[in-house]
């Protein structure tokens, strides 16, 4: 039915452009609630900017559903693909399309952002039109990163995320966060600008006629050139996704950011980009023994280190951040082990981490709304006071620590299985990280929920409102549903990960010494 | 070279005699006798002056620039003595060694040489004024420099038409051209007049002797000088006067050329020709020297602002416009097929007559020719009074006496004032 | 002859550069700059003996420019003097980073 | 080249020598007998007040600047004036005469442009009052 | 004896310049009949500056039209090849006129506040841009010198044009002295080149150099001195020391003019001399220019980091931009040149816009705005803050939100990496430097958005003209940032359409191959 409307022709461009358009509308037409509250000014006309933003994001989510709908599970290659002529002189087209890898990301993003906004409705109450506009721009960038097939368009989308995030964190974040957000931008920028050089070099090597990934995948490169380009790409993505040791900006930025921004920072955009671009474009470099083992070791270190550091945190938000760092390690591990299971596991982990992190940050935000702090020392015994909250927190935390039956388990399990087949030692070490994860997860739950109510203020905290309940129930339902029925994603990611591995093995740049990967499982 | 020594000697003698001539002329104009003690008819007066100057004590005012004070007279003296070297004095002289140009240094860029060297003289005056540490002297030096540079432009521009006709900067060629076409004073009357006025100003002679206006500045830049140093300034001034006269003669009155005949211009050259042309040249030059002195004892001195405004707002535009007119006219005559000859000159003369008429009626309007007082109509008098009133009011305003004090004149940097 | 002129020109230019580097008086700096230009003029004239009239034309143009520059420089230095009462550049301190 | 200017150089040397001689002789023949009163600058008998080298009217600077600018215009006009006839002829001249019908307005046009620019500057200076001395 | 050079050909070749200078002189005459100072009617006289500035803008548009027509006609340069008639000249002319028009608007805006400018300032600006246009077309060292001086003399005056301001006077004297000295170097270089080659025409110089087995020391020292002089003019490190002081002291519109348009013209002539004239000697100057570019990028960005004074910051940033542009000259082929043109378009728009904002927040005070002045701008004038962010991001080279700035860097990087001898290291230096530059540009952004408005800071107000300038610049940057093809098409045409008089001896690109055999 959807196909008959030709929806696949316009849905992806719409997903990319609608938020930008909506951003302008929200900025111009939205009403700033805080001004009404302060009574400084006569309420300007128009609806509440937050409502407008949410509506726009809801439209975006609907579009994502449409994409999901038109996606052919058995199809090969790009789906819902659209090519819009753009810069003829560079050979750049606005080429959009999804496959099994990006589809989950698109849907995840399109749902998580509005939920996060709804869940942190009162987190931001000042200058909401601008806030909404920036959030929409950011959404456009996020979606763009997942659906663009042209490297120039991808780079534009990639950088489009930067400034809105910077402003969201800096302006609406806790006081004195401009430094943290600046650090985030600078870190990211160094990486992405190096990537820009690599993109141009790659394009140049491909004859300077096209920036489309399909074209560039066919470009044969010298090992040396591959290595440099891969390192440039990897630098950009690793910084963005906060791989240890490039992770230092993440906890600072996330803990300072307004909830929505923290959620978007937690989305594993970089990890996706590594799977999508860095590995298939430069397989020989990625599978080079030194490079690969270094990254694998780094990943494992990230898993363990993230978990260990998370254990030592005294602030709930920072625990979430470090757990996210730890997850990223697993995703990287899965990506670079590059077996069908591990890649699928990585995809699952990206999704699970996205959902769980969102849920946790929303919960932290709810705490913060109520008590203006998220330090463990301020809380305790909330289980009795806030039952809804507690349930949501426990489920989310269990998913984070990969309890079977939650989505988190699926991802980690697949990654670890895949890794075990290739690198048993690494798998074992990484598994220890999972155990540490249990420790920090339980510790957080215990410190927040189960000790005595030792602070007067905590006794009278209101439980989740209807709005908050709706958001948390949705997220928890997603975690549990995907935990028991991961098929919905795995089925779609299967072909894509196969294709990825094939392109690595048989592409023009395939490594001469193949990694010991068994295709038949 | 012999030529240098001979001509230099003659030159110095002429200068010396000129001081006497000037005084004699002044006496004549004023109906008195002039110097008559030293020698017969005062003929040895210059010698007496010279000896006196050598013996006279020199004062050394407590100035900061002792060396500049000493060098300044030399700086005025040297260029004055150099300029005349390029002026052709007569038709070439046949000698056993071939034809010899009757100029000390017959350089091909004679005209430029005169312009260049004569403008160096201003350094002497400025430095004299500066190093004297005397307010009169400083002001005199400044005035002379401002005046000389102002009129140098008018002078330069007024000679361009000559170049237009001659097509060369060699003074000899200019003389030759006039021999062929007739004197430039006919074809370029206005240029001649502007040149003459500028020449007066350049030599700091009355009516433009503001730098040494004795009624205002005692003696101007050489107030503090005495003895031979003073004498050197004096020599320089007279030397310049001769040079300028000779230049006028050369550029506008045919130089050593004899009018109405080609006899003197064509080979073979003989000693007789040289002598005759030399005399012709000397007569022409002498006439202009006479004019210089005549004017000195006839006309009153200009006011300084009148002087500057004459130079900048009348001489310069007139000279500029004249260049354009002559350029157009000569091109037009060429287009009409008039060959360069007497007819050409006549045509230009006609043009000049028209131009002079225009100049006198339209441009002058009673400013130059007749004294303003003779022409002021009652209504104009009223206007002038009102203007004077306005000026004094403004002056008061500037002093802050009147409330509506306006700013200093914007647009140009105005500071101090004297 | 040309070589000598070039050497003189180079020396004059060098004097100008050294003056520019070592002096702080605006007038002297200005004079040094003019000296540099005129040193170059000398070079041009010398080279013109080899290569024809182009150098002379260039010299006239440089002179023009130098004249305009001189007029301008004088005006600017006067302005400086009016504002600061000095032409010593090291006393000019309104612009500090 | 050098031969043409040799007389000038000789004359220059001669004149400089003369100047030095005059200054030197007069320096030797006289005996300075300075007294304090004799040494003070002559200002019509009034004791001088302050240094002579005070600030003087900016007008003098202005004239200097204008001179520099306008004098250079003359520098351009001289070569133009000298070559005017050649510039007015579209083909090389024959015996100093331009062949009939070959007159060109190139030289005149160039100079008119030049003069026009000069006049604009002149009018500007004039209207700004830089030429009036008050 | 006007041999072969008919007056008509000269007229045709120089028509835009003549139009512009003629118009400028008319404006000058108009300005002189404006009462000022203590003359009666001086109050209306102040108005006149604004009127004249607007006329200047119109004049720029007219001349721009003439340029477009000339380009469309395929107008050639002068027959003797001393003035180019190629696309590069016309394109640079257009950029210069754009910058001049915008600067005139800025002038008008600033004048509304401070009344600091006399009525002749617009015509000064136009005369400066006449000089720049001469530079854009100069194919003869004589014209180069003439253009440089025509431009510089007017800009010296412009720097000191606020006569009430001591800062302005100081800027003028510093600019003047350094400018005069750099002219000296430039000229000496020209003299030595003339001495070595016997001509001042770039074409002759190229032919001479191509015919030599070894290049004489005279020639090379000429090139070196020329390089130094040009480096002074474009403010490349280490010859940049005058820049911050001069930019700081000069009136804001003039600073904008200097940092965008003057730089454009200087780079145009730099490129023409280096690429067209001295390409044969490329192996010899290449290394020097390489280091110049690298050092300039680093120095500009590093020194900008510590500035609180926004104008000084932009001054250092303009030094850094000079470094980026030098990269395109080092690349030296058609791609590099078109990248240069694209870059200056983007840079002009961003600079003019940014200075428009600075003029607005400065409110006519006689001092440079600092970070404190712009702090919390977002709270009072959100759109202004957004526009400023766009401009800063364009400087930085951020895609989408920085608009054209990104593609400007992209094209330079592309040219650098595509060149026959790829400049990979310079490209990396460039991007790292850009990343560093983000620190200070974002410091301004963060001041605007993340700091409270200081007490007592007045709410800036704009004139409609300035407002439209800022808006236009920002929108143009954004639009062409998503679809840069028109501008790039223009830039590309500029470097591929050559006039009949273009140098056949040195087609671009092949030059390098020829010189590869030149022994060092």
UniProtKB/Swiss-Prot annotation, chain C:
Predominant place of localization: membrane
Location(s) in or outside the cell: Cell inner membrane
One Pfam family named in its UniProt record: Oxidored_q2
Domain of life: Bacteria
Coiled coil: none
UniProt keywords, alphabetically: Cell inner membrane, Cell membrane, Membrane, NAD, Quinone, Translocase, Transmembrane, Transmembrane helix, Transport, Ubiquinone
EC number: 7.1.1.-
Catalytic activity: a quinone + NADH + 5 H(+)(in) = a quinol + NAD(+) + 4 H(+)(out)
Membrane topology according to the record: Multi-pass membrane protein
Catalytic EC class: translocase
GO cellular component terms, A-Z: NADH dehydrogenase complex; plasma membrane
Transmembrane segments: 1-21, 27-47, 58-78
One GO MF term: quinone binding
One Gene Ontology term from the biological process aspect of the record: ATP synthesis coupled electron transport
Subunit structure comment from the entry: NDH-1 is composed of 14 different subunits. Subunits NuoA, H, J, K, L, M, N constitute the membrane sector of the complex.
Function of the molecule: NDH-1 shuttles electrons from NADH, via FMN and iron-sulfur (Fe-S) centers, to quinones in the respiratory chain. The immediate electron acceptor for the enzyme in this species is believed to be ubiquinone. Couples the redox reaction to proton translocation (for every two electrons transferred, four hydrogen ions are translocated across the cytoplasmic membrane), and thus conserves the redox energy in a proton gradient.
Family, similarity comment: Belongs to the complex I subunit 4L family.
Protein name listed in UniProt: NADH-quinone oxidoreductase subunit K
Source lineage: Bacteria, Pseudomonadati, Gemmatimonadota, Gemmatimonadia, Gemmatimonadales
Swiss-Prot record, chain E:
Region (Disordered): 494-520
Lipid bilayer topology: Multi-pass membrane protein
Transmembrane segment boundaries: 13-33, 55-75, 87-107, 115-135, 141-161, 176-196, 219-239, 250-270, 285-305, 313-333, 339-359, 383-403, 425-445, 468-488
Ranges of compositional bias, category Low complexity: 494-508
Pfam family, one: Proton_antipo_M
Any one GO molecular function term: NADH:ubiquinone reductase (non-electrogenic) activity
GO biological process: ATP synthesis coupled electron transport
Entry EC number(s): 7.1.1.-
This protein's UniProt keywords: Cell inner membrane, Cell membrane, Membrane, NAD, Quinone, Translocase, Transmembrane, Transmembrane helix, Transport, Ubiquinone
GO cellular component, one term: plasma membrane
Reactions that this protein is recorded to catalyse: a quinone + NADH + 5 H(+)(in) = a quinol + NAD(+) + 4 H(+)(out)
Subcellular location: Cell inner membrane
Assembly information from the UniProt record: NDH-1 is composed of 14 different subunits. Subunits NuoA, H, J, K, L, M, N constitute the membrane sector of the complex.
HAMAP family for this protein: NDH1_NuoN_1
Function: NDH-1 shuttles electrons from NADH, via FMN and iron-sulfur (Fe-S) centers, to quinones in the respiratory chain. The immediate electron acceptor for the enzyme in this species is believed to be ubiquinone. Couples the redox reaction to proton translocation (for every two electrons transferred, four hydrogen ions are translocated across the cytoplasmic membrane), and thus conserves the redox energy in a proton gradient.
Family: Belongs to the complex I subunit 2 family.
Annotated protein name in UniProt: NADH-quinone oxidoreductase subunit N
Organism of derivation: Gemmatimonas aurantiaca (strain DSM 14586 / JCM 11422 / NBRC 100505 / T-27)
Lineage: Bacteria, Pseudomonadati, Gemmatimonadota, Gemmatimonadia, Gemmatimonadales
């Amino acid at each position: 039915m959807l196909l008959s409307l030709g929806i696949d022709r316009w849905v992806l461009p719409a997903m990319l452009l609608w938020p930008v358009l909506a951003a302008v509308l929200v900025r111009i037409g939205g009403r700033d609630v805080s001004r009404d509250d302060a009574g400084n000014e006569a309420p300007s006309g128009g609806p509440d900017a937050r409502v407008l933003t949410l509506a726009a994001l809801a439209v975006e989510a609907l579009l994502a559903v449409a994409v999901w709908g038109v996606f052919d599970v058995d199809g090969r290659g790009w789906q819902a693909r659209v090519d819009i002529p753009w810069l003829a002189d560079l050979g750049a087209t606005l080429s959009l399309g999804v496959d099994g890898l990006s589809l989950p990301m698109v849907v995840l993003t399109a749902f998580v952002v509005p939920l996060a906004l709804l869940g942190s409705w009162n987190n931001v109450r000042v200058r909401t039109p601008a806030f909404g506009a920036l959030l929409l721009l950011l959404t456009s960038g996020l979606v763009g990163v997942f659906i663009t097939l042209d490297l120039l368009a991808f780079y534009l989308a990639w950088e489009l995320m930067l400034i809105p995030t910077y402003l969201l964190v800096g302006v609406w974040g806790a006081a004195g966060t401009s430094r943290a957000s600046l650090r985030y931008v600078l870190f990211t920028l160094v990486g992405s600008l190096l990537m820009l050089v690599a993109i141009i070099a790659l394009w140049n090597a491909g004859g300077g006629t096209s920036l489309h990934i399909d074209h560039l995948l066919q470009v044969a490169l010298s090992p040396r050139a591959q290595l440099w380009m891969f390192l440039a790409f990897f630098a950009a993505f690793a910084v963005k996704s906060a791989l240890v040791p490039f992770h230092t900006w993440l906890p600072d930025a996330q803990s300072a950011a307004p909830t929505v921004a923290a959620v978007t920072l937690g989305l594993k955009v970089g990890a996706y980009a590594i799977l999508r671009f860095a590995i298939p474009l430069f397989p020989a470099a990625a599978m080079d023994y030194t490079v690969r083992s270094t990254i694998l070791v780094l990943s494992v270190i990230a898993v363990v280190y993230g978990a260990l550091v998370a254990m030592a945190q005294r602030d709930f938000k920072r625990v979430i951040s470090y757990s996210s760092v730890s997850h990223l390690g697993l995703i990287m591990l899965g990506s670079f082990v590059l077996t069908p299971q591990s890649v699928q596991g990585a995809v699952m982990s990206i999704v699970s981490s996205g959902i769980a992190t969102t849920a946790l940050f929303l919960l932290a935000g709810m705490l913060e709304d109520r008590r203006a702090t998220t330090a463990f020392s301020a809380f305790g015994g909330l289980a009795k006071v806030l039952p809804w909250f507690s349930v949501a927190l426990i489920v989310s935390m269990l998913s984070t620590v990969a309890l079977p039956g939650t989505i988190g388990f699926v991802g980690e399990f697949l990654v670890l299985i895949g890794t075990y087949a290739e690198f048993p030692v690494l798998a074992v070490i990484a598994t220890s990280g999972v155990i540490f994860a249990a420790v920090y997860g339980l510790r957080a739950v215990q410190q927040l929920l189960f000790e005595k109510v030792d602070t007067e203020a905590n006794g009278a905290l209101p439980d989740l409102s209807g709005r908050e309940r709706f958001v948390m129930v949705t997220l928890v339902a997603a975690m549990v549903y995907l935990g028991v029925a991961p098929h919905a994603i795995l089925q779609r990611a299967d072909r894509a990960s196969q294709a990825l591995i094939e392109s690595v093995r048989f592409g023009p740049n395939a490594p001469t010494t193949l990694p010991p990967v068994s295709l038949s499982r | 070279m012999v030529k240098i020594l001979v001509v230099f000697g003659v030159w110095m003698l002429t200068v010396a005699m000129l001081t006497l001539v000037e005084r004699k002329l002044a006496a004549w104009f004023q109906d008195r006798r002039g110097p008559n003690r030293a020698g017969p008819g005062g003929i040895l007066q210059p010698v007496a002056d010279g000896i006196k100057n050598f013996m006279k004590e020199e004062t050394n005012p407590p100035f900061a620039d002792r060396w500049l004070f000493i060098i300044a007279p030399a700086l005025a003296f040297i260029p004055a003595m150099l300029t005349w070297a390029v002026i052709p004095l007569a038709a070439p002289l046949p000698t056993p060694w071939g034809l010899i140009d009757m100029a000390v240094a017959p350089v091909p860029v004679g005209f430029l040489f005169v312009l260049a060297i004569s403008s160096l003289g201003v350094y002497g005056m400025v430095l004299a004024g500066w190093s004297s540490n005397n307010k009169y002297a400083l002001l005199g030096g400044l005035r002379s420099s401002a005046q000389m540079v102002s009129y140098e432009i008018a002078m330069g521009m007024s000679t361009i038409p000559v170049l237009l006709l001659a097509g060369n900067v060699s003074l000899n060629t200019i003389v030759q051209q006039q021999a062929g076409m007739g004197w430039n004073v006919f074809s370029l009357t206005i240029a001649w007049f502007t040149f003459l006025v500028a020449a007066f100003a350049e030599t700091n002679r009355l009516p433009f002797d503001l730098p040494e206006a004795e009624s205002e500045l005692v003696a101007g830049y050489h107030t503090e000088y005495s003895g031979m140093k003073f004498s050197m300034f004096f020599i320089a001034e007279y030397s310049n006067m001769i040079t300028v006269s000779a230049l006028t003669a050369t550029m506008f009155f045919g130089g050593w050329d004899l009018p109405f005949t080609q006899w003197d211009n064509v080979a073979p050259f003989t000693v007789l020709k040289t002598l005759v042309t030399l005399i012709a040249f000397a007569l022409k030059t002498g006439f202009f020297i006479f004019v210089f002195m005549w004017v000195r004892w006839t006309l009153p001195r200009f006011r300084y602002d009148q002087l500057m405004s004459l130079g900048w707002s009348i001489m310069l535009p007139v000279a500029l416009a004249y260049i354009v007119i002559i350029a157009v006219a000569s091109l037009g005559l060429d287009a009409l097929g008039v060959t360069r000859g007497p007819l050409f000159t006549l045509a230009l003369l006609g043009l000049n007559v028209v131009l002079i008429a225009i100049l006198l009626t339209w441009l002058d309007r009673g400013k130059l020719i007749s004294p303003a007082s003779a022409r002021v109509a009652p209504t104009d008098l009223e206007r002038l009074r009102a203007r004077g009133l306005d000026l004094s009011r403004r002056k008061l305003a500037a002093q802050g006496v009147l409330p509506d004090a306006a700013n200093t004149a914007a647009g140009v940097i105005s500071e101090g004032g004297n | 002859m040309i070589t000598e002129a070039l050497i003189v020109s180079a020396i004059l230019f060098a004097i100008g550069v050294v003056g520019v580097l070592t002096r702080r008086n605006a007038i002297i700096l200005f004079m040094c700059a003019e000296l540099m230009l005129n040193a170059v003029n000398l070079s041009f004239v010398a080279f013109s003996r080899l290569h024809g009239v182009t150098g002379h034309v260039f010299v006239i143009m440089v002179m023009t420019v130098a004249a305009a520059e001189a007029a301008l420089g004088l005006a600017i230095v006067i302005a400086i003097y009016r504002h600061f009462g000095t032409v010593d550049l090291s006393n000019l301190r309104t612009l500090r980073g | 080249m050098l031969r043409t200017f040799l007389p000038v150089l000789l004359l220059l040397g001669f004149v400089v020598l003369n100047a030095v001689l005059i200054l030197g002789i007069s320096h030797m023949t006289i005996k300075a007998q300075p007294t304090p009163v004799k040494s003070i600058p002559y200002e019509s008998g009034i004791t001088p007040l302050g240094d002579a080298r005070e600030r003087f009217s900016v007008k003098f600077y202005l004239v200097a600047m204008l001179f520099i600018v306008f004098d250079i215009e003359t520098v351009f006009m001289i070569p133009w004036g000298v070559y005017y006839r050649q510039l007015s002829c579209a083909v090389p001249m024959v015996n100093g005469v331009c062949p009939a019908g070959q007159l060109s307005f190139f030289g005149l046009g160039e100079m008119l442009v030049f003069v026009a620019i000069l006049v604009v500057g002149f009018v500007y200076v004039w209207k700004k009052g830089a030429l009036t001395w008050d | 004896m006007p041999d072969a050079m008919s007056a008509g050909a000269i007229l045709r070749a120089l028509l835009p310049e003549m139009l512009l200078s003629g118009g400028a002189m008319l404006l000058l005459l108009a300005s002189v009949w404006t009462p000022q100072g203590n003359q009666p009617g001086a109050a209306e006289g102040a108005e006149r500056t604004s009127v004249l500035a607007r006329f200047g803008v119109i004049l720029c548009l007219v001349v721009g039209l003439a340029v477009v027509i000339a380009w469309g006609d395929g107008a050639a340069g002068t027959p003797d090849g001393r003035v180019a008639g190629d696309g590069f000249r016309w394109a640079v002319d257009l950029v210069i006129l754009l910058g001049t028009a915008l600067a005139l608007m800025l002038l008008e805006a600033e004048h509304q506040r401070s009344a600091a400018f006399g009525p002749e300032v617009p015509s000064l600006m136009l005369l400066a841009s006449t000089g720049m246009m001469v530079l854009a077309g100069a194919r003869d060292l004589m014209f180069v010198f003439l253009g440089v001086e025509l431009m510089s003399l007017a800009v010296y005056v412009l720097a000191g044009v606020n006569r009430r301001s001591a800062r302005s006077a100081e800027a003028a004297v510093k600019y003047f002295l350094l400018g005069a000295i750099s002219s000296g170097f430039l000229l000496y270089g020209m003299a030595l080149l003339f001495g070595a080659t016997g001509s001042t025409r770039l074409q002759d110089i190229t032919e001479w150099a191509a015919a030599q087995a070894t290049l004489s020391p005279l020639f090379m020292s000429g090139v070196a001195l020329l390089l130094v002089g040009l480096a002074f003019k474009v403010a490349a490190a280490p010859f940049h020391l005058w820049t911050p002081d001069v930019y700081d002291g000069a009136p804001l519109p003039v600073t904008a003019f200097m940092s965008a348009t003057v730089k454009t013209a200087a780079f145009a002539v730099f490129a023409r001399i280096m690429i067209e004239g001295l390409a044969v000697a490329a192996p010899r100057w290449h290394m020097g220019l390489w280091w110049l570019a690298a050092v300039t990028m680093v120095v500009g960005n590093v020194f900008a980091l510590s500035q609180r004074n926004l104008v000084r910051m932009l001054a250092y940033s303009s030094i850094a931009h000079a470094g980026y542009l030098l990269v395109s000259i080092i690349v030296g082929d058609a791609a590099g040149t078109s990248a240069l043109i694209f870059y200056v378009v983007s840079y002009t728009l961003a600079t003019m816009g940014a200075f428009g904002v600075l003029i607005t927040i400065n409110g006519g005070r006689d001092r440079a705005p600092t970070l404190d002045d712009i702090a919390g701008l977002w709270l009072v004038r959100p759109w202004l803050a957004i526009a400023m962010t766009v401009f800063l991001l364009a400087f930085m080279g951020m895609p989408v939100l920085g608009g054209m700035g990104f593609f400007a860097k992209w094209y330079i990087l592309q040219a650098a990496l595509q060149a026959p001898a790829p400049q990979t290291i310079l490209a990396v230096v460039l991007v790292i430097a850009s990343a560093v530059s983000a620190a200070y540009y974002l410091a301004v952004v963060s001041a605007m958005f993340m700091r409270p408005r200081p007490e007592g800071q007045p709410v800036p107000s704009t004139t409609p003209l300035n407002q439209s300038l800022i808006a236009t610049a920002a929108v143009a940057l954004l639009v062409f940032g998503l679809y840069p093809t028109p501008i790039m098409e223009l830039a590309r045409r500029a470097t591929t359409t050559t006039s009949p008089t273009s140098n056949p001896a040195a087609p671009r690109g092949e030059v390098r191959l020829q010189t590869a055999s030149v022994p060092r």
